[in-house]
């Protein structure tokens, strides 16, 4: 029996003001409306349909669109999962799945697609009847293997095609490793290795030794940074080995909900987490989402400090090239000379602060200040911007030190489902930028869902309220490289191995290959370990907070990363091979005396 799908028409997508802002006075859009598509599991009754219409502020469709933008084929949008959750809670049982489309009657489709279409998360159609395809089951992509142990030159091609950003030393290391193992490498192992060993994750430039023609008294840039901490250790409780630093607070307190569901002041010692990080590459490609997910990642860094902490306030900063606000250039400005795939400094300045502030606000944390500055000299400048996301939080003194997990402990993935977004973000942000890899760059930009992060934080807060009885032994946020970086890092830090079953991990995209499931950078996720006997308590909290979680696998005594998906062995690598000591490059810095113009 064919699936029954009904369509309802909702409100306008854009206000008239927003439409002019996006498309100008000569907008190609004649009509723009949200369309709600519902796949029914049985015949919907009249009173149930009226309840649906009231919830969605919708009615029968009144126009015929010639452009419909939907979630990408094979995926379920975050809006859909939230809406279905609401339908379930108010007793609507006939709707199997609900999706929201952007529907237009347009004069010029291409103009609308350029401004309103995200090719990583959306598909587009010319008629409503064609959109029924998104409710059909799609075929999953397969695991791919490459015989680099037989052909050492193959890795050069893969490095370029997959955007791995491996240097010659790393390629030689991989070739030698798989010749020793005498087997092919999987695409998941390649992508995982490239993320874990990217500049973004391993900070190779900061850890390398520099040769300079001016005095430099430290072995590396990291040593220079750390030397400032050594001068005042009295107030620093934790630095450089966790997701954020912890400094001594002066009589701070923490309001929390007790076991009786009443607010109370925590009476123990409370200290302060502090963190800044950058999210440059994504902000340069897509300023709003790049800055939003930059702030989201910094929030997760705070939460995943020690055994759990609570974010309190955030801030952001931007360093960009000259703004060129009008056709009349200022005395210090020349004609723009940036790569085509990067957003303009003007667009970054307008969109990035809104993205960061929006994420903070929707999560429920104030963004309290920020800064921006410009720098450009001849052909050099912040064409690729610096986007700095920072924040402070509160942490109980008893939670500052991470616990000691044991073999057999459950490995939990908490938060939103896996989606094909942000693939290869660690290596993309670490590679040389050209117009040739613009599609790979766009694929590496994450998409934000601050509501899901708030749900995850509510779960962590419940464990935080248990203070010394918090069952979480070790926690990492999921950032660059996704769980393919977070879970191996957790294994390395705990000196244990891990066995993961990818089938267990929540996914909103049924077409994703094992590599994509393992390596995507879907946001708003954490990985942590917890004794198996405490999983029931976690389940109860997650149900109350409506936050998804998966028991992804178990810690093992054998220091090996083993990842399976049905009958596929996706990853099988020893920790020593994955985190091998790869020689760092020697870097050279030369001093230049710049002749600056007077204005």
Segments predicted by a language model, with ranges:
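Repeat-solenoid scaffold signature
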Residues: 526-545
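Core nucleic-acid recognition elements
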Residues: 1-434, 438-466, 474, 479-483, ...
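A structural-propensity feature for long, helix-poor, extended segments
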Residues: 510-516, 522-525
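Structural signature of cysteine-dependent C-C bond-forming condensing enzymes
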Residues: 497-501
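Catalytic PLP-binding core of fold-type I/II PLP enzymes
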Residues: 490-493
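Short alpha-helical "recognition helix" segments of helix-turn-helix
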Residues: 599
């Amino acid at each position: 029996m064919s699936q029954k799908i009904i369509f309802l028409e909702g409100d306008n997508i854009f206000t008239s003001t927003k439409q002019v802002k996006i498309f100008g006075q000569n907008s190609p859009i004649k009509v723009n409306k949200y369309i709600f598509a519902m796949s029914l599991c049985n015949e919907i009754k009249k009173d149930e349909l009226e309840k649906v219409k009231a919830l969605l502020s919708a009615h029968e469709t009144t126009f015929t669109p010639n452009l419909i933008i939907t979630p990408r084929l094979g995926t379920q949008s975050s809006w859909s999962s939230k809406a279905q959750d609401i339908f379930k809670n108010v007793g609507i049982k006939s709707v199997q799945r609900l999706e929201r489309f952007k529907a237009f009657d347009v004069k010029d489709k291409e103009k609308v697609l350029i401004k309103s279409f995200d090719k990583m998360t959306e598909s587009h159609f010319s008629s409503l009847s064609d959109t029924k395809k998104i409710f059909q089951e799609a075929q999953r992509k397969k695991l791919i293997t490459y015989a680099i142990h037989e052909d050492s030159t193959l890795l050069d091609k893969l490095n370029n095609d997959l955007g791995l950003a491996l240097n010659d030393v790393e390629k030689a290391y991989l070739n030698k490793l798989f010749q020793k193992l005498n087997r092919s490498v999987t695409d998941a192992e390649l992508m995982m290795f490239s993320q874990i060993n990217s500049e973004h994750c391993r900070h190779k430039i900061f850890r390398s030794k520099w040769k300079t023609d001016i005095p430099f008294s430290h072995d590396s840039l990291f040593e220079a940074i750390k030397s400032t901490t050594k001068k005042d250790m009295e107030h620093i409780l934790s630095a450089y080995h966790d997701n954020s630093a912890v400094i001594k607070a002066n009589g701070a307190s923490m309001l929390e909900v007790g076991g009786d569901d009443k607010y109370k002041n925590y009476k123990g010692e409370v200290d302060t987490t502090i963190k800044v990080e950058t999210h440059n590459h994504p902000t340069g490609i897509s300023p709003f989402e790049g800055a939003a997910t930059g702030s989201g990642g910094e929030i997760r860094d705070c939460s995943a400090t020690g055994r759990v902490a609570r974010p309190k306030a955030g801030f952001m900063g931007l360093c960009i090239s000259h703004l060129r606000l009008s056709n009349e250039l200022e005395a210090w400005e020349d004609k723009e000379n940036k790569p085509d795939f990067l957003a303009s400094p003007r667009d970054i300045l307008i969109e990035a602060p809104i993205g960061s502030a929006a994420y903070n606000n929707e999560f429920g944390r104030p963004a309290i200040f920020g800064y921006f500055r410009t720098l450009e000299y001849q052909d050099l400048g912040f064409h690729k911007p610096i986007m700095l996301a920072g924040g402070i939080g509160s942490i109980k003194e008893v939670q500052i030190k991470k616990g000691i997990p044991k073999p057999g402990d459950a490995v939990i993935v908490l938060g939103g489902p896996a989606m094909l977004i942000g693939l290869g973000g660690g290596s993309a942000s670490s590679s040389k930028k050209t117009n040739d890899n613009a599609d790979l760059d766009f694929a590496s930009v994450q998409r934000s869902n601050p509501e899901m992060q708030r749900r995850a934080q509510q779960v962590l807060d419940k464990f935080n309220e248990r203070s010394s009885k918090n069952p979480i032994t070790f926690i990492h946020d999921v950032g660059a490289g996704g769980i393919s970086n977070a879970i191996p890092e957790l294994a390395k830090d705990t000196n244990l191995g891990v066995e993961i079953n990818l089938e267990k991990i929540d996914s909103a995209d049924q077409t994703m290959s094992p590599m994509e499931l393992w390596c995507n950078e879907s946001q708003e996720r954490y990985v942590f370990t917890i004794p198996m006997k405490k999983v029931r308590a976690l389940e109860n909290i997650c149900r109350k907070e409506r936050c998804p979680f998966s028991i992804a696998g178990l810690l093992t005594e054998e220091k090996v990363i083993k990842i399976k998906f049905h009958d596929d062995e996706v990853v099988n690598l020893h920790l020593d091979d994955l985190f091998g000591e790869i020689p760092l490059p020697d870097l050279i810095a030369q001093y230049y005396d710049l002749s600056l113009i007077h204005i």
